[in-house]
Structures are given as structure tokens and as C-alpha cells.
Regions:
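N-terminal/domain-start alpha-helical segments
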Residues: 1-110
């Protein structure tokens, strides 16, 4: 399964990428929202892990634009914001799930 990881934190991104690779996933990693939106538009991914706090274009806008193009790739939103309004906003924008940092790699891989 090919997964797009959009995360600007180098340490966290490398950990997520390595953890998913250990579970047999092919992971392409981008570090900003513009690149994430461009990659999602290709339709090449079976899932995406999208940080909301991306530079150049925030993850929420990437998600909205992706869904506006009727792209149905499952998207897991990743953020440090553990607030109910943020969760509702992400799910309303089309996220399939909402994960709070720090994450459990076994939970993510499932």
C-alpha cells in the first residue's frame, strides 16, 4: 500500500516513515502543504497522513482542496491540537480519522 505522509517535523516524519515501512507500507514523504496537495492530486496513494500544521499551506486547506476535487483517498489528520472544535473541523472537512501527536505507530499502521 502506498501512503503519502505530509509532516514538516523531521524527527517525527522520519519516525512515522520508518514505522510504517516496517509494517510493509511504501511511504512518500513531503514536508509542506503545497507538495501534499500536488501529490494527492495525482491519485497515486491508497491513504494519506496529513499534519494540520504544515508550512506554505496548512493541512486543513490541503484536505478541503483534495475533497473539493472529489478525491476520496482516505486521509488521517495528524495534529498536536487535542480540542473538540479542531476534531470537528477536520472531520467536517473530510478527514477519515483524527490522530493526536504523539502517535502510536502500531495504531497508525492498523
Amino acid at each position: 500500500m502506498r501512503i503519502l505522509l505530509a509532516e514538516d517535523d523531521e524527527l517525527l516524519g522520519s519516525g512515522i516513515r520508518a514505522g510504517l515501512a516496517q509494517h510493509g507500507f511504501q511511504v512518500d514523504w513531503v514536508r509542506d502543504g503545497v507538495a501534499a496537495e500536488r501529490e494527492l492530486a495525482t491519485g497515486a496513494y491508497q491513504a494519506a497522513v496529513l499534519d494540520l500544521g504544515l508550512p506554505r499551506q496548512d493541512g486543513m486547506e490541503v484536505l478541503r482542496q483534495t475533497r473539493a476535487r472529489r478525491n476520496t483517498t482516505p486521509v488521517l489528520v495528524l495534529t498536536a491540537r487535542d480540542a473538540v472544535p479542531a476534531r470537528i473541523e477536520g472531520l467536517d472537512a473530510g478527514a477519515d480519522d483524527y490522530l493526536i501527536k504523539p502517535i502510536d505507530l502500531h495504531e497508525l499502521a492498523a
